[in-house]
Amino acid sequence: MTNIRKSHPLIKIINHSFIDLPAPSNISAWWNFGSLLGVCLILQILTGLFLAMHYTSDTMTAFSSVTHICRDVNYGWIIRYMHANGASMFFICLYMHVGRGMYYGSYTFSETWNIGILLLFTVMATAFMGYVLPWGQMSFWGATVITNLLSAIPYIGTNLVEWIWGGFSVDKATLTRFFAFHFILPFIISALAAVHLLFLHETGSNNPSGITSDSDKIPFHPYYTIKDILGILALTLTLMLLVLFSPDLLGDPDNYIPANPLSTPPHIKPEWYFLFAYAILRSIPNKLGGVLALVLSILILAIIPLLHTSKQRGMTFRPLSQCLFWLLVADLLTLTWIGGQPVEHPFITIGQLASILYFLTPLVLMPISGIIENRLLKW
């Protein structure tokens, strides 16, 4: 068996990636989120496949087909809610994974980091299109508002929006193409994830100390496989508690009302995992400025490696940078809360201040703290 594992052309790749892979001996539970994201992706593809067998991407029947899945299909309700809440778990793991990369300086692996940013954008696009498919009020108006933002692009904006819509408003053509893209994108994400791993295994994993661990490696199996299984069990428990006890906790009640172009909901808002970006978009009174800020709120991750001024890699031994990192986390939570609130005083002001702080912390304060810490250590 050992010979096949090490000599078979296909099994050999799996062996070098998940069994005999040399891994640092000191990586913490924060390194579990990569495998959890893989599990989430597989879960989403499988549940999505079964949903696609019963879903119809037509404006007249989309809402009814989702109701039919929940009421008439065997265990359709659990498949639907695992898919909806699985997306929330996916984003929790995704944000934790990105946060860990920022905290421990994993962004110095530039290829892995950049592929990761591309993955983040792709997952966000997939989730947005998936939210449109049930064709409830929030699906329809969310699609209308977010796609309409592209009209802020000079010269080509209006034509671009109508091209994406497939007409003069969000309608049957829009729903059909969103379903097609929502179906194909997870497979593209899988391919990108494989490239992400390929680049990671070129350099090897980072570790909490931030220094090279070449002198102290251990095999991935059994040490980290068992550790990953514990993480998967925790993820499964959390997901099933959510699905079985409060499946609609993270959803919007308005999405149980069929889409009606003649009636606008009082508060249009996306799913909770996009609220921070939505709050940044709303905090800028100018449409084009808001769209640019929205894109930059994610693209800022690509700038972070260029602004790394510290001579240490991670923040493990940098208390000043740690304070700023947790300030950024608190700011993100504030933005998430603001994104779900109506556009009125005092939420507008809080949102604007939180948006300024969101860009100020990684672009200005963190590089300065890196320089100060170098000076304090006489480097």
Curated annotation (Swiss-Prot):
Q: Name one GO molecular function term.
A: metal ion binding
The record's section on Gene3D superfamilies has:
Cytochrome Bc1 Complex, Chain C
Q: Which domain of life is it from?
A: Eukaryota
Q: Does the keyword Lipid biosynthesis apply?
A: no
Gene Ontology cellular-component annotations: mitochondrial inner membrane; respiratory chain complex III
Location in the cell? Mitochondrion inner membrane
Q: How is the cofactor bound?
A: Binds 2 heme b groups non-covalently.
Q: InterPro entries under this entry?
A: Cyt_b/b6_C, Cyt_b/b6_C_sf, Cyt_b/b6_N, Cytb/b6-like_sf, Cytochrome_b, Cytochrome_b_C_euk/bac, Cytochrome_b_N_euk/bac, Di-haem_cyt_TM
Which CDD domains does the entry link to? cytochrome_b_C, Cytochrome_b_N
Keywords per UniProt: Electron transport, Heme, Iron, Membrane, Metal-binding, Mitochondrion, Mitochondrion inner membrane, Respiratory chain, Transmembrane, Transmembrane helix, Transport, Ubiquinone
Cystine connections: none
Does this entry carry the keyword Amino-acid biosynthesis? no
> Which residues are involved in binding heme b b562?
H83, H182
Q: Which cofactors must be present for this protein to function? A: heme b
Record-annotated residues binding a ubiquinone?
H201
Q: Where does heme b b566 bind?
A: H97, H196
Q: What membrane topology is annotated for this entry? A: Multi-pass membrane protein
Among PANTHER family, the record links this protein to:
CYTOCHROME B (PTHR19271:SF16)
- Similarity section: Belongs to the cytochrome b family.
Assembly behavior: The cytochrome bc1 complex contains 11 subunits: 3 respiratory subunits (MT-CYB, CYC1 and UQCRFS1), 2 core proteins (UQCRC1 and UQCRC2) and 6 low-molecular weight proteins (UQCRH/QCR6, UQCRB/QCR7, UQCRQ/QCR8, UQCR10/QCR9, UQCR11/QCR10 and a cleavage product of UQCRFS1). This cytochrome bc1 complex then forms a dimer.
Summarizing the function annotation, the protein's role is:
Component of the ubiquinol-cytochrome c reductase complex (complex III or cytochrome b-c1 complex) that is part of the mitochondrial respiratory chain. The b-c1 complex mediates electron transfer from ubiquinol to cytochrome c. Contributes to the generation of a proton gradient across the mitochondrial membrane that is then used for ATP synthesis.
The UniProt record's further free-text remark is: Heme 1 (or BL or b562) is low-potential and absorbs at about 562 nm, and heme 2 (or BH or b566) is high-potential and absorbs at about 566 nm.
Please state what the protein is called.
Cytochrome b
